[in-house]
């Protein structure tokens, strides 16, 4: 509609003209001429038959209204079209802008040179009147009147923009603006193309932009941000030179983070996580609320809800990714194949480990403790994660997908597998029926991870290995000092006592203590021999040469500290008993009570009030001490009561003469350091009755007690001629439902 050189042959007009944005393509330049000034040869004189068409088009709208007078000189609608074609003025010789435009335009050059407004606003009116008189007969007046308001608006706007620019041969024209805008758009387009082709400096994948100082992909960007925000530390299983590319970037996190830093990604560019202003940080909360006596609810002004909410928010923030990222497991009615289930199970396990590494206080533990905790609770965490993501489990599709019906697996294994799947499915369905939300799942997982019993189990499993090592060192005649070796055991037992005392406040100590008591048989055997040596026996026993390994287990974990006065007597007695003939192991005392469970006389001790740093005074197991029968011994003194623990009557130590040393015990030389180890441990701990730990021995009554030779155990079992031997069938049990006052009964 607008007159421009694009109507002439040889030009390409991709779309209709508009007065808003102009580019080289809009004004009719060919594509090869869009980036520079067209040469002189690009223009040609149109045929004579086209001259009238161009003139009529230029002057068409102007024939109805004549010239339009403005404040700075005249402008006409024909000048609108001529301004759009003013880009080719740069190719022409710079004409004088003060001369008046002629009324006739024999060619394109005259039309362009005479259409520009002069600096003093002179010649636009003359140009319009001349062009109007030359070609007014061929124009429809109605068309011009309809387009008058639109053309007037465009003409006024363009006049204002042109008036603001200095005119002349060196002036800025719309052509230069159009060329500059086109070049900018071309440069931006080339930048976008080049950005899309840039590879990630870390793994070589397609870059999504510049992140933290370097062009990286989204995966490396997220990995670097997560590592910096959470202060994560990694370890390399190789030589710290693992290949990091698109296919191996997830195999070694240490080398990946190392390469991120090497390529120039900046830690300081990562924004740290912000705590909302309404919720103070945990550090400030710890300083604000000073917990007294371990009871946070007793603090004045303490808001337990806000305090716990802050921890819950931290647990939720530690989630590696929302449950919607688990994929198709979120679809309740979807039946998954065995491959997808295996992949999802691995993903759930990895997410549990990732979650545990980011929750409060867990990273502060040692790496060995972290691994031990996760090994203990991974199954519970897996069930909670599977229920949280609504993992669909159906036994029949699982078996069909796994091909168990055609597998060579034995029938009993298939049945066991079915039982495991069924139990797992029942647990998941029960949790799903409760409609547990994300916060509750996070709290449940934290409770499972930080259960006190799990921490004690770790220590309990370490003690037998430690004691075995100590026994090996002492048995081989190591040059190391026995006191130094036993100090390690004593420190470990002190730590167990501390943990045990803390757990008793939560009413969980008996079960954990019972589980730990499976390794006390060695020391109890030595102590029992010392006790039975002082009780008159009616039958002689056969000599057994089986060695006795000192096993200072949890026999001392709930015991009272002894005074220093009885140490020498106990040491002398144990040294003598290590070389003496084993006494009769009939297991009975004068009163007919079975002494195999440790309910007889204890070792000599002097109760010391106030020395309860290692004593578990609040233990419910102490009630079993009050009911323990004392042996019928004339030398037994009266019981010494204490304010915290009921003591068992004990006999006085019987000095052993040197003739006892000439007994026929084959392993006497070996048992001397063993007896010393047991004696040194017994200086600080008093052996509790074995009846208090019956459930542990019920679990292991088919196996030989820890630290006692097989031959020695069988000899003790057969020498009495009855079923109540020392290490035969146990005569104690744990009754959790007893109403007799003590849950531990004979």
Swiss-Prot record:
It comes from the Eukaryota. Residues 122-141 have a biased composition (Gly residues). Keywords: DNA-binding, Metal-binding, Nucleus, Receptor, Sensory transduction, Transcription, Transcription regulation, Vision, Zinc, Zinc-finger. The keyword Oxidoreductase does not apply. It is found in: Nucleus. A zinc finger (NR C4-type) spans 200-220, 236-260. One of its GO terms (molecular function) is RNA polymerase II cis-regulatory region sequence-specific DNA binding. The keyword Zinc-finger applies. One of its GO terms (cellular component) is cytoplasm. Residues 56-68, 171-191, 606-645 have a biased composition (Low complexity). SUPFAM superfamilies: Glucocorticoid receptor-like (DNA-binding domain) (SSF57716), Nuclear receptor ligand-binding domain (SSF48508). Residues 307-556 form the NR LBD domain. Expressed in several embryonic tissues; dorsal vessel, oenocyte and fat body. CNS expression is dynamic and confined to temporally restricted subsections of the NB lineage; expressed in many NB and GMCs, but only a small number of neurons. Residues 38-191, 579-645 are annotated as: Disordered. GO terms for biological process: cardioblast cell fate determination; cell differentiation; epithelial cell proliferation involved in Malpighian tubule morphogenesis; fat body development; glial cell development; glucose homeostasis; heart development; lipid homeostasis. Residues 197-272 bind DNA. Residues 83-101, 158-170, 592-605 have a biased composition (Polar residues). InterPro entries: NHR-like_dom_sf, Nucl_hrmn_rcpt_lig-bd, Nuclear_hormone_rcpt_NR2, Nuclear_hrmn_rcpt, Znf_hrmn_rcpt, Znf_NHR/GATA. It holds the Pfam family zf-C4. Its main location: nucleus. Belongs to the nuclear hormone receptor family. NR2 subfamily. Receptor that is required in photoreceptors R1, R3, R4 and R6 during eye development; generation of the ganglion mother cell-2 (GMC-2) fate in the nb7-3 lineage, coinciding with the transition in the expression of HB to KR in the neuroblasts (NBs). This is Steroid receptor seven-up, isoform A.
